Design a protein with these regions (language model features):
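Auxiliary, metal-adjacent structural segments of Zn-dependent hydrolase domains
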Residues: 11-61
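Active-site recognition of the HExxH zinc-binding catalytic motif
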Residues: 84-96
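Metalloprotease/metallohydrolase-associated module, dominated by Zn2+-dependent proteases
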Residues: 7, 19-28, 35, 100-182
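Short, contiguous pre-domain boundary segments
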Residues: 1-13
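Short pre-active-site segment immediately N-terminal to the catalytic Zn-binding motif
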Residues: 33, 52, 65-87, 122-124
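Alpha-helical membrane-targeting segments
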Residues: 1, 47-56, 60-61, 98-119
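Short, solvent-exposed loop/turn segments at secondary-structure junctions
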Residues: 45-49, 65, 71-73, 91, ...
Length: 182
């Protein structure tokens, strides 16, 4: 059985833990009460057998998060790029809770583009990985501001294509995310 994290312990490879209080507060700012936060496990391990999960790839196929090199003991205390990744992965928890077949769609996620345009569609009209990117990119925009968002865009973590002026971006995210989280 995998090691379960005790308070103030550093999680070892192969260990699992629940969300920290800080992480819950962070994700509640995005998903409100639409996720059962007490049941979300974070693994410091490969989801795939024989450690086949790429060391720099996070996976969330079953409502639980699997990190290898990108694991942090508390993502709420991490830098903005790791918080973006954490919110992206928590988006898959949210999608699964809404009934999306995350495992099935995830089988081909390495083939799909995470890039998107904000063209007036609702979030629900985008594919799975683009939904998660839009949610995480907007989180970065709202939390770290336009310049923090632009920094991650320069690193190709934020994957929006098109116009990048602050007022237009703000308006387009609001339009795409209207009614979110449902």
């Amino acid at each position: 059985m995998a090691e379960k994290k005790q308070d103030n312990d550093k999680l070892k490879k192969g260990g699992i833990r629940l969300l920290t209080t800080g992480e819950i507060q962070l994700v509640q700012s995005v998903f409100a009460s639409t996720i059962n936060y007490a049941s979300v496990w974070i693994h410091k391990d490969s989801y795939l057998p024989f450690n086949l999960q790429n060391e720099n790839t996070a996976m969330t196929p079953n409502g639980e998060l699997y990190f290898r090199n990108q694991y942090h003991d508390d993502f709420s205390l991490s830098l903005d790029d790791m918080q973006h990744l954490f919110i992206h992965e928590m988006s898959h928890v949210w999608q699964r809770a809404r009934g999306m077949n995350v495992i099935g769609r995830g089988l081909v996620s390495w083939l799909v583009s995470y890039r998107y345009t904000l063209d007036g569609r609702l979030l629900s009209e985008y594919p799975m990985e683009q939904q998660a990117q839009i949610i995480a990119d907007n989180f970065t925009f709202q939390t770290h501001g336009y310049y923090g968002w632009q920094k991650l865009r320069g690193w190709e973590i934020v994957t929006l294509d098109g116009n990048t002026s602050e007022p237009i971006i703000r308006e387009m995210y609001q339009k795409t995310l209207r009614g979110f989280p449902w």
